[in-house]
A protein has these predicted regions:
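Class I SAM-dependent methyltransferase SAM/SAH-binding core
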Residues: 92-136
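N-terminal auxiliary segments of SAM/dcSAM-dependent transferases
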Residues: 1-37
């Protein structure tokens, strides 16, 4: 990243003139602590592998499968790829993506605590971690071949807005991939919202519900969207232990 526009803090690139906003980060980290999703350096370096007795083992088995599928797909392109992961968290997936030959990867997030941990643990020369919100054009319209939302699209209030912005940062033949997030049918979204509010209220952090959004799968079809993997029904998820998340690929309009 250019020293003209960015400074470094503990290995993380921060746009000059931007002061980190910790309002969301504090709530988010508090939730993650209660959910046992704050990991040590020794743990994140091995993700998505995690101890079988860990509370989040099933979740990570799902993420392991989606990670493998995505990396297999990207490797088949057999070309140089500039990759942007929006909402990279502790950086485990960005690190895995950077292991693909001929890639340059940027992990972007507004959680400075996890970004600093990521920069400390994952130090590959083709991997950088950047603090900031893509909606503020902090990347100066830099172009990427692949933009990934992995378990992060639900933290953006408007999928239409964020996908349009991602498309602006996408090369002509580039792709946006959305994985590891629930996308709902219209008939189930209100119940999901209510369950979310109750979940955070019972946790003692009700304000977190204001930062978690429930997007409709149908809203994604306004774009040039291909379903790489269908979402799994509740029955199959419960009894067959299959990934309940869809995998969507969005390209520029034809």
């Amino acid at each position: 990243m250019s020293g003209e526009y960015f400074s470094q803090q503990n290995g993380v690139y921060i746009p000059k003139g931007i002061l980190p906003d910790t309002s969301f980060e504090k709530l988010y980290l508090l939730v993650r602590q209660k959910e046992q999703r704050v990991y040590s350096n020794a743990e994140i370096v091995n993700l998505p592998e995690i101890a079988t007795h860990h509370k989040q083992h099933y979740e990570w088995s799902v993420r392991k499968d989606s990670c493998k599928s995505l990396i297999r797909y990207l490797k088949k392109k057999n070309q140089f790829l500039r990759i942007l992961e929006i909402g990279c968290g502790n950086g485990w997936l960005s690190h895995k993506l950077a292991e693909i030959p001929r890639t340059e990867v940027i992990g972007l997030d507004i959680n400075l605590t996890e970004l600093q941990q990521a920069a400390n643990v994952f130090t590959k020369s083709n991997l950088q971690f950047v603090y900031g919100d893509i909606r503020k054009n902090i990347l100066q319209n830099r172009q990427f071949d692949i933009v990934i939302f992995a378990g992060s699209i639900q933290y953006f209030s408007s999928p239409t807005e964020i996908i349009h912005l991602a498309l602006e940062n996408l090369t002509a033949r580039g792709e946006i991939h959305i994985i590891d997030s629930f996308l709902y049918d219209a008939k189930e979204v209100e119940a999901a919202k209510q369950n979310c509010r109750e979940y955070y209220r019972e946790m003692g952090i009700p304000d977190m519900a204001n930062y978690y959004f429930h997007h409709l799968l149908n809203d994604m079809y306004q774009f040039n969207c291909t379903v790489k993997q269908q979402r799994t029904s509740f029955f199959k998820k419960l009894f067959l232990k299959r990934n309940a998340f869809p995998w969507l690929c969005i390209r520029h309009a034809l």
